[in-house]
């Protein structure tokens, strides 16, 4: 990936998550919204065969908005800014689909998990209804 493209992605996705923190944490838990991000990087949209509305089928839409007020009750909320269709935070780092790469993956990549085989690895190949993401 060219340096200019990496810089553009970094700019679009900085910060990669938001923390809605309480003034004082009084609740014994942390809430997380890993699939409600709505920042779709330009390079991702350009590589997708789907329009933005179709890509949103994999979002847990607005869960971050529903729960952002938990901070008022003493619990923090961590919310990803990018969508699950771009990168799924509830996957192993190397739960990767070989179909999405031009070069062989390292031996330690988990290429045979049920999720990868189904198109839903760390980098998804499909959206929630089974439509292919990439051209």
What is the role of each PLM region?
Residues 2-135:
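N-terminal catalytic or cofactor-binding beta/alpha core of small enzyme domains
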